[in-house]
Amino acid sequence: MHCPFCRHEDSRVVDSRSLDDGSAIRRRRQCQACGKRFTTMETTALTVVKRSGVAEPFDRSKVINGVRKACQGRPVTSDDLAMLAQEVEETVRATGNAEVDAHDVGLAILDPLRRLDQVAFLRFASVYRDFESLDDFEEAIAELRAGDGDDRGRPAVQPRLFTR
């Protein structure tokens, strides 16, 4: 890592801290030549490839905004959406691929959204899966009903203690 002050090539790490739920590392460095300190940020790159072929960095806020529309009028908080976006990012990163299709991001949204709010799940799935008839909705509802009670291996949802 080059020193931003004297451009010397050698620096030593003085301190490291994990940020953003472990997806980034902040390092405090000291130049071996001039002794000045500077901060660097390290993150692993995760790129989303859209249908058009355009590649862009993964952005949690896009996940939140897409799901927020499906959750309008539902008892879903901003914290719930932030946790869902974090889970989606963790799922996508767990594939080990530096590039993922936008379609795969959408698939990663479906299960956590189903657990969060079934009505929002139906709204999102109807657009994402391109529902064309009532039969498509009935099929999705049947999936939801079949999945009820089968929460093995899924994180528990903490009940709300206070309502707003």
UniProtKB/Swiss-Prot annotation:
PROSITE patterns annotated for this entry? ATP_CONE (PS51161)
* Species in which this protein is naturally found: Micrococcus luteus (strain ATCC 4698 / DSM 20030 / JCM 1464 / CCM 169 / CCUG 5858 / IAM 1056 / NBRC 3333 / NCIMB 9278 / NCTC 2665 / VKM Ac-2230) (Micrococcus lysodeikticus)
Q: How is the cofactor bound?
A: Binds 1 zinc ion.
Q: What is this protein called?
A: Transcriptional repressor NrdR
* Role description: Negatively regulates transcription of bacterial ribonucleotide reductase nrd genes and operons by binding to NrdR-boxes.
Q: Name one GO biological process term.
A: negative regulation of DNA-templated transcription
Query: Known NCBIfam families for this protein?
Result: transcriptional regulator NrdR (TIGR00244)
- Cofactor list: Zn(2+)
S-adenosyl-L-methionine is among the record's keywords: no
What region holds the ATP-cone domain?
46-136
> Which is one GO molecular function term here?
DNA binding
Record key words, sorted: ATP-binding, DNA-binding, Metal-binding, Nucleotide-binding, Repressor, Transcription, Transcription regulation, Zinc, Zinc-finger
ZnF region ranges: unnamed: 3-34
Q: Which InterPro entries match?
A: ATP-cone_dom, NrdR-like_N, RNR_NrdR-like
**Similarity section:** Belongs to the NrdR family.
Q: Which Pfam families match?
A: ATP-cone (PF03477), Zn_ribbon_NrdR (PF22811)
